[in-house]
Amino acid sequence: MVFLLTALHLSTFLLREMYQIADIFEDHFAIVLFLWSLFLIPSVAVPFMSTRIARDGLLAFNVEHMKVAQVIVQVSRLLRARQTLRTLRFVAEMKIHLRENVRRNNEQVMLNVEEKPQVPLPQAPRRRSSIIPIDATATFKAARRRSSTHLDPLVTAGVLRSIQQTPLPLPVASKATFEPPLSPLAAYLTPRKQRGDAYRREMERREIHTIFCLFDVDGSVCYSQ
């Protein structure tokens, strides 16, 4: 339609307007040339601009050019890099969470140990000349028979001390050890898988660097958000 209207305008100018302008301004040839150029500008500019607009429209609404392998590869890389950034953020938050939990547990254990009463250390038993074990009950009965009316307080205290069971020291909770989580790529079955994982990590590093360069507009190697 645009080309038909342009052709109609050009034919009208060539067959009618051109001779009328020449008859009206026959004494001023410069004015005639100027008017002719003004009438010819639409006939030249409209086809050129229409061709350019049609080409851009075809490229914009063409779906086939979106199926190029390079475009798909770039989109997949961006998606994997975005997923990698989310994974790294999750790992960092999990490490901070685990460290806070370990520190809080250590502080609680130390506080519980300080609040508990200190247990006296058991005295080392004296060596006996005989290897036969001495029955504390028999010793107490013999001392009672020796003094039927009055018990020796020293002997009684020694017997009671031997009868009573020495309380065992409370076990002190061992200090909790914290190990950072290992990467799922830490264990390799074959050297080929190890090389493949190294290649994959290098590709992810390059993709993350590419995305970071998009944020780092001013070149300060940092971004606020």
UniProtKB/Swiss-Prot annotation:
A motif (RxLR) lies at residues 77-80. Residues 1-18 form the signal peptide. The chain crosses the membrane at residues 29-49. Keywords: Membrane, Secreted, Signal, Transmembrane, Transmembrane helix, Virulence. It is found in: Secreted; Host cell; Membrane. It is a single-pass type I membrane protein. It comes from the Eukaryota. GO terms for cellular component: extracellular region; host cell; membrane. Belongs to the RxLR effector family. Has the canonical translocation RxLR motif, but lacks the canonical EER motif, which characterizes most oomycete effectors identified so far. Secreted effector that completely suppresses the host cell death induced by cell death-inducing proteins. This is Secreted RxLR effector protein 160. It comes from Plasmopara viticola (Downy mildew of grapevine).
